[in-house]
């Protein structure tokens, strides 16, 4: 994933001064000639970080703020489902949650713990929205029950064609 930290001048997709993170949450500087040919074809999500108190990002060591977002990226990259869209960006507004923006413009709030349960809830909600011809604008996946969902009121979906059995 790309790291986004505008306060430190780090922006996603910057081949010269960009920073990448691996699946374990270890950051490293982007090396244009080495990394760009491999990642140019992939649409890597970006993870926004608040600037550390030291004023510098730590390379080569596991970063706690990246652990859950990178675990979620890994979980969703292995999920095969027609309902799960791709991750565009992840932001961390506070210490107990992070927000994910998906390619279908849905925004989901996750807790750092119980990601598998939250991904299951997201998949169920997206499937239900599709079956009822609605689009989810925002969903908070932190509660275990009664997950709050905000639907797009302006969204018009053409009903799905249902096969007729003869």
Walk through the language-model features, giving the residues of each.
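Charged, solvent-exposed interaction patches on well-folded alpha/beta domains
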Residues: 1-166
